[in-house]
Amino acid sequence: MKVFSFTIGLVVIISLFAFALAYDEETDLMKKLVEMERAIEQRIICAPEGGPCVVGIGCCKGYSCAPGLLGLVGHCQ
């Protein structure tokens, strides 16, 4: 009975440790994504003539986005 209790306790401790590590990695990933998003927002992004245009990246002044295949990615003209 003591071996069973010890085994269950060990499994619980290892599981908690694994969840803690996974949470830390997820938190770090979210921080990196937020930093990347801020960097993109700070830059002025526009696509030149013939360049791809998608949601969030529009065409430079004087060009408009022509819809592409299935309306996913267009091109500036």
Swiss-Prot record:
GO CC aspect terms: extracellular region
The protein, known as: U8-hexatoxin-Mg1a
Recorded domain comment: The presence of a 'disulfide through disulfide knot' structurally defines this protein as a knottin.
Record localization: Secreted
Main localization (coarse): secreted
Stretch forming the signal peptide: 1-22
Keyword match Signal: yes
The species this protein was found in: Macrothele gigas
Propeptide position ranges: 23-43
GO molecular function, one term: toxin activity
Keywords: Disulfide bond, Knottin, Neurotoxin, Secreted, Signal, Toxin
